Amino acid sequence: VNDKPTGAPRLAGIAREEDALVVDKSLIADEDGVGPYSVIWQRSSSKTDWQAFPDAVGEILPLTQSHVGYSYRAVVSYTDGHGTREILVTSPSETVINVDDPVEGEVVITGKPLEGGMLVANTERVFDEDGIASLSIGWESSKYGRNWQAIETTSTSRFDLSQSMVGRQIRARVSVVDTFGVETVIFSQATNTVKNVNNKPAGKILVRRVGS
């Protein structure tokens, strides 16, 4: 007569990105003997509808960004000494929580710092493993590259250089909000000082005759 196993496997570890879940089988006992264990993993976003997670193999589940938002459980099976296959399931883990990943990459400014010219802030190299929900660009200027002031007249990736920017350095300020609502602000490298372009005088010279 088959003897049912006593005890149950359980999950150890913290359900958090960059940590790991480990199957603890130390409490499992079977009077018919315990053969080699096999472990498969399942996951669910609701702890009700479980799906096989074939990406994970073995007793340790390292938690990465792709695991965030899911709960996991392990299905442990073995064949006892009389050839009966036994299946045990752990209680589900807590939902794996996110750990904020830093924004990577850089903002690159193209264009010449010259009056009448245009600078463009390129954000194609900006990356966040947590995903990017929104990205906004602002511009700042500084006389000596130390105290930076926001330029309120523009909030696009393009910035036209007017006479008022001559003698100042320019940089782009980029606000990145990830899909978990965390905001990170990064800056481009500052440009060289914006150079002046000579503006021709306007108007005419009038010669008036004075006296007789």
Q: Model-found features: residue ranges?
A:
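Ser/Thr/Pro/Gly-rich low-complexity disordered regions
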Residues: V1-S212
